[in-house]
Amino acid sequence: MKSVDLKILDARMRDYLPTYATPGSAGLDLRACIDKAITLEPGATTLVPTGLAIHVADPGYAAIILPRSGLGHKHGIVLGNLVGLIDSDYQGQLMVSTWNRGQTAFTLEPMERLAQLVIVPVQQVSFNVVDEFGASERGAGGFGSTGRS
């Protein structure tokens, strides 16, 4: 299994290091590394620091930042860019673009769990221009082509 070194930029994070909640967990919780609460009004966005820096280094891997399901479902708090992609050569602090798509103001407290970090494999592709594709059962069938008849 690949190990990725996470560097801590903020000493306050020492007591809040990300951990996997269960042996089957794919994501690590990212926290709001802020000094005081932030209130997000409906429709508002803000960048929230996590206090963590990452350098994946291996181009065969990347990190993605995903929303926490409870915050999105209960409070309308999601990522402003829906999914954050962290390339293997990025070396800075992880920031979470936070968007309140709900109808009421939401207050984000210091060190509150805000998003999840997942490390994923990456396969870079090369392109080959062709005149046509080989036959397949599906062909060019698009939206809904494998659903209801």
UniProtKB/Swiss-Prot annotation:
HAMAP family the record matches: dUTPase_bact
GO MF annotation: an example: dUTP diphosphatase activity
Classification via NCBIfam families: dut, PRK00601.1
Family stated for the protein in its record: Belongs to the dUTPase family.
Cofactor: Mg(2+)
Record has Nucleotide-binding as a keyword: no
A matching Pfam family: dUTPase
Function, as annotated: This enzyme is involved in nucleotide metabolism: it produces dUMP, the immediate precursor of thymidine nucleotides and it decreases the intracellular concentration of dUTP so that uracil cannot be incorporated into DNA.
Taxonomic superkingdom: Bacteria
Protein name, as recorded: Deoxyuridine 5'-triphosphate nucleotidohydrolase
This enzyme's EC code(s): 3.6.1.23
GO-annotated biological processes: dUMP biosynthetic process; dUTP catabolic process
Keywords: Hydrolase, Magnesium, Metal-binding, Nucleotide metabolism
Species in which this protein is naturally found: Bordetella avium (strain 197N)
Residues given in the record as substrate binding sites: 68-70, 81, 85-87, 95
EC main group: hydrolase
Record pathway: Pyrimidine metabolism; dUMP biosynthesis; dUMP from dCTP (dUTP route): step 2/2
Reaction catalysed by this enzyme: dUTP + H2O = dUMP + diphosphate + H(+)
Upper classification of the organism: Bacteria, Pseudomonadati, Pseudomonadota, Betaproteobacteria, Burkholderiales
